[in-house]
Amino acid sequence: MPPAVSLSQVSVRFRLATGGTYAAVEDASLAVAAGEFVAIVGPTGCGKSTLLNVAAGLIAPSSGSIEVFGAPLGGLNRQAGYLFQAEALFPWKTALDNVAIGLETAGTPRAQARERAQTWLGRVGLSEFGARYPHMLSGGQRKRVGLVQVLIRDPRILLMDEPFGPLDAQTRQIMGNLLLDLWNADRKAVLFVTHDLEEAIALSDRVVIMSAGPAARIIGDWTVKLPRPRDIAEIKIEPAFQDLQREIWAMLKAEVLRGYAQTGGG
């Protein structure tokens, strides 16, 4: 089977108002197999989200190519579901309606869509919260609603852009375990962007490292050989986890410091 997503020698350059160009990503190649969980880590502003947007078909590369299950990608990647860092819930709709709306807009009868939405809410422990509006939910609860809002449409690929970034450490850990439970159930291809190296190792099969920008490149690709299923808290105290973290950090640290210097610490 061809990779779920394959980026080959992708470069992305943006035109500046001054007439010049800014190279965000340069010559990046990355393949994510069906059922594989791959995390991308790099300094702030290195182009991680840009690369994810290319995989989603939201940004066309300046050069290079993208294939989805072996077919060239032209336009939006309709095989993928995208979970952003910012919440995408409609504030005037209940949790149940927020989850069901994707099915309804795709033509599923309302009653059937709501029934499936209720089932999905149950899978993330929110069976009793379907009638609540987003402002009545905690940050972690809203993230769970957002996650099943994407998963209910059964995408073959899941693109995730720092989805747990705004959450506190304890809630991030809970969400990480929940994500792994859901992923273990059907093993979708996942491309997960994070700035947190520990999170990347704990969740993924592979950790891909990007250099500081501009013209960020993929400079490292590690296989995570930790056993599954995993518990986020427990796996972090394993010697093999700590050894891998030190090994990756030895490369990542220099890029983080370089990115920090380039942005003035912003």
Would you name each region that the model predicts?
Residues 41-43:
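The feature captures the beta-strand-to-loop junction immediately N-terminal to the Walker
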Residues 56:
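Helix-to-loop junction immediately C-terminal to a conserved catalytic motif
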Residues 64-75:
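Conserved ABC transporter NBD signature motif
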Residues 100, 104, 111-129, 181:
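Conserved ABC ATPase "signature" region
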Residues 147:
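Hydrophobic anchor residue at the start of the ABC signature
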